[in-house]
């Protein structure tokens, strides 16, 4: 398993580098890329945002392993994960309104503080302290995915008055470097935990200086901005009306809830499947992120003017790949007949599918959901998404250890078949909808929204 992991990592990394180098050679520089004021503004944003992302990714490979290291049972670990997901649901519902009221800059600094406290709780072996840490992690995750983007968009439009068309360029670059940071974070986690022999708590301690630096830079370099015009209740009510009045939005939300709930369960299960076979967890995680980056690169190539595939087609392909991978996992995790290499390949395929899924879903959401209602609609998407993931982990909590993992993959397979049916339903509704198609390339090359 050790050799397989390193070999897969090298092959995936080489594939990603090859695709990115060919893209860089072919990509012309635009006006936004050469504007000094815009580049300085981007740098101010990226310095803080990338440090926050790096700290987040650094903790991912060894979370389950840390709880195992503290001798908690799988059922107890499942409850810790459920606590984190439930916290994400609760704080995610009010995060946008809280950030708008408190201030985006203050919210980013608050993220650094709460996530640092979350990391510090990992030094304790007390179960209650770890539960509190998971709750803090849920709050931090909600702030990470709301405060930073809200701050950037407001500053971009209101303070600097840059063109709206330049916003996707910033987030497309951020999406690419997010993958790169994730790959590097996996290697760094492996280095501090295993190569340096510091144990599974080391990545969490190493994340604290990154979070402190991110908070300090935001406090020193960023201006404050607010948006106190819209109440949380009005945001949710408007989102619910949009969700119920447009079948496309309802189907898209169903696909997102089903697909991403399975991904949450996958995040919990991959470590107990591979770790008993001597897998280097940091390198495995980096391989996953490289596979996801490869999927994103393939999405960009597929939607380019040369191939001109549509995001709806790639969304369908992503769901199909995950269905196939989960069926593989139901066989590769059979008690007494485990095949860790086959399971690893299935996990890589799931991550490749995620690389296709997220830009496709992002494109379709932006086209289907009115901009003013996106926050409210996404709140309603998050509730079933996290509830499904929590239910799945609770089912695993009550299962027999030997068969529970395989049963969980079987349930996930059934959930993804339902997602596939929802994709077919959405495809039927939107097949003649020109609004949801990438426009034919004329003049300037198309840059997909990531």
From Swiss-Prot:
A biological process term (GO) from this entry: monoatomic ion transport
Subcellular location: Cell membrane
Gene Ontology terms, MF aspect: molybdate ion transmembrane transporter activity
SUPFAM superfamilies in the cross-refs: MFS general substrate transporter (SSF103473)
Membrane topology label: Multi-pass membrane protein
InterPro entries recorded: MFS_trans_sf (IPR036259), MOT2/MFSD5 (IPR008509)
Alphabetized CDD domains for the sequence: MFS_MFSD5_like
Residue stretches spanning the membrane: 1-21, 43-63, 79-99, 128-148, 176-196, 198-218, 249-269, 278-298, 311-331, 344-364, 376-396, 409-429
Cellular component terms (Gene Ontology): plasma membrane
Chief site of localization: membrane
Keywords annotated in UniProt: Cell membrane, Ion transport, Membrane, Transmembrane, Transmembrane helix, Transport
Functional summary from the UniProt entry: Mediates high-affinity intracellular uptake of the rare oligo-element molybdenum.
Protein family according to the UniProt entry: Belongs to the major facilitator superfamily.
Name of this chain's protein: Molybdate-anion transporter
């Amino acid at each position: 398993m050790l050799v397989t992991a390193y070999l897969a990592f090298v092959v995936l990394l080489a594939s990603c580098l090859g695709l990115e180098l060919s893209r860089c050679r072919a990509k012309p520089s635009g006006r936004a890329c050469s504007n000094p004021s815009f580049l300085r503004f981007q740098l101010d944003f990226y310095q803080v945002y990338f440090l926050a992302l790096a700290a987040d990714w650094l903790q991912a490979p060894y979370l389950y392993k840390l709880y195992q290291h503290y001798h908690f049972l799988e059922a107890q670990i499942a409850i810790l994960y459920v606590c984190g997901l439930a916290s994400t649901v609760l704080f995610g519902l009010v995060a946008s309104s809280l950030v708008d009221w408190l201030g985006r800059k203050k919210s980013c600094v608050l993220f650094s503080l709460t996530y640092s406290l979350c990391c510090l709780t990992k030094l304790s072996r007390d179960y209650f302290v770890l539960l509190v840490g998971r709750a803090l992690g849920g709050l931090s995750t909600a702030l990470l995915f709301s405060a930073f983007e809200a701050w950037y968009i407001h500053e971009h439009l209101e303070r600097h008055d840059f063109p709206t068309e330049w916003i996707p360029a910033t987030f497309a670059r951020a999406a690419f470097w997010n993958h790169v940071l994730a790959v590097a974070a996996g290697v760094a986690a492996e280095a501090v935990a295993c190569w340096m022999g510091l144990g599974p708590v080391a990545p969490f301690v190493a994340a604290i200086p990154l979070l402190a630096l991110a908070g300090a830079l935001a406090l020193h370099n960023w201006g404050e901005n607010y948006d106190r015009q819209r109440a949380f209740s009005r945001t949710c009510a408007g989102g619910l009306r949009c969700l119920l009045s447009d079948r496309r939005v309802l189907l898209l939300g169903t696909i997102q809830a089903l697909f991403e709930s399975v991904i949450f369960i996958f995040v919990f299960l991959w470590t107990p499947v591979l770790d008993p076979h001597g897998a280097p967890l940091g390198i495995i995680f980096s391989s996953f992120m490289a596979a996801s980056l490869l999927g994103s690169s393939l999405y960009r190539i597929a939607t380019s003017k040369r191939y001109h595939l549509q995001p709806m087609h790639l969304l369908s392909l992503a769901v199909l790949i995950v269905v196939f991978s989960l069926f593989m996992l139901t066989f590769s995790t059979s008690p007494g007949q485990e095949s860790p290499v086959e399971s690893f390949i299935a996990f890589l395929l799931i991550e490749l599918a995620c690389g296709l899924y997220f830009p496709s879903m992002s494109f379709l959401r932006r086209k289907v959901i009115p901009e003013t209602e996106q926050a409210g609609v996404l709140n309603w998407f998050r509730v079933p998404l996290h509830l499904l993931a929590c239910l799945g982990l609770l089912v695993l909590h009550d299962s027999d250890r030997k068969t529970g993992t395989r049963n969980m993959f079987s349930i996930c397979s059934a959930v993804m078949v339902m997602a596939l049916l929802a994709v077919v339903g959405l495809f039927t509704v939107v097949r003649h909808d020109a609004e949801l198609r990438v426009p034919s390339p004329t003049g300037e090359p198309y840059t997909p929204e990531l």
